[in-house]
């Protein structure tokens, strides 16, 4: 699942809302793929649906937040035209789960 967002940060209140949203999606297991684009694996559609419900409860009042669910195969087929995979992506690799 990909979470992409563009949130205003002009006022102190908007900055707090941005930081809180970012912190909350990271608590949901999302890792930063690139600036304002976060990714997380979902082994089943029912899990994606429950994550979507939780994300809907924490979105700030202003801005733009989008979610999209894609398969692992589609994610693996993503082409990187410039740059490289993030450190978090390298650590995760193609594994669905990280055992700590």
Positions of PLM-derived features:
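Basic nucleic-acid-binding interfaces
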Residues: 1-2, 8-100
